[in-house]
Amino acid sequence: GSTWPSRCHSTLLGDRPHFIQPAPNRVDLLFKDIPESATGLYVFVLLYNGHPEAWTYTLLSTANHFMNVLTDRTRPRLGEHFYTDHGHQLFTPHPSEATTQELGAWTRHYLAFLLIIICTCAALLIALVVWGCILYIRSNRKPYEVLNPFETVYTSVPSNDPTDEVLVFERLASDSDDSFDSSSDEELELPQPPPAAQLQPYSSLESADASRGRSGFKVWFRDTPEASPEPLHRPTPPVGPDYSKVASKLRSILK
C-alpha cells in the first residue's frame, strides 16, 4: 500500500552521510548541518530484497551567494555576435536596448492598420444592412396603377350628319301633365327625314365631305355585310306607356 515504508521496520539507510537524516514519517529525507563540501548531485535508490524498486535525484548547492539569472528577450541587432571566442574567457552578453522611437513607430503602424481593417468591416456591414432593408421594403410594396377618371372614352364614331341627331329623353312627364291642353292630344304629323345616301363598297369620306359638315373620319364598309348571329335569348320589350307622341310634341316645340 501507500504506507508500506512506515510499516517496514527493517528499512536501512545504508552507508549515508551524517547530514542526511530520516524524517519522522520515515519516508522523506532531511539535510541537516550540511558542510560546504557537500555540494553535488545526490541519487537515491530504494532497494527491496537487493533489487531497486524506485529512484530519484536532487542537486545540492552550498554557495553563500546566489546570482539572479538575466533573461534577455530582445532580438539581437544585425551584426552582433554574442558567442565570441575570447580565449577560454567567460563572456557575458549584455541585453540589447530597444529604442523607444522604434517601438513607438511600430506601435503606431500596427494601430493604423488595425483601425483601417475595423473601419472597412464596419462600412461593409452598414452597406449590407442598408441593402437588406431596401430589398425588404421593395418586396413588401404593393404595385398599384393610377387610373385617370377623366380619360376620354368614345362609344361611337363622331359625326356631324344632321340626320344622326336623335333626342333621347331619360325622364318625361307623366300622362297627367297639365302643361298641354286638350287639343294637344292630337297626333302631330311630322315630315319624314330624307333617306340617307347609300355609300359605295369600300368607299371613304374624303376631304370634300369634311367641307360639307363631316367630321373627317374615314369609314370603310364591306361589300356584303355579315348578318349578325341570332341571339340565344331575345330580350322582351319593356311594357309601359308610349311616350312617342309626347316626344314628337316636344321636338316640334324645340324647333
UniProtKB/Swiss-Prot annotation:
Mapped to this chain, the residue ranges on the Virion surface side of the membrane are 1-110
Question: Does the record's keyword annotation contain Transmembrane helix?
Answer: yes
Query: Motif Internalization motif: where?
Result: 154-157
Q: Does the keyword Transmembrane helix feature in the UniProt annotation?
A: yes
Subunit record text:
Interacts with gI.
Q: Where is this region: Acidic?
A: 173-187
Membrane topology term reads: Single-pass type I membrane protein; Single-pass membrane protein
> What is the scientific name of the source organism?
Equine herpesvirus 4 (strain 1942) (EHV-4)
Q: This protein is called what?
A: Envelope glycoprotein E
Q: Which gene encodes it?
A: gE
Source organism phylogeny = Viruses, Duplodnaviria, Heunggongvirae, Peploviricota, Herviviricetes
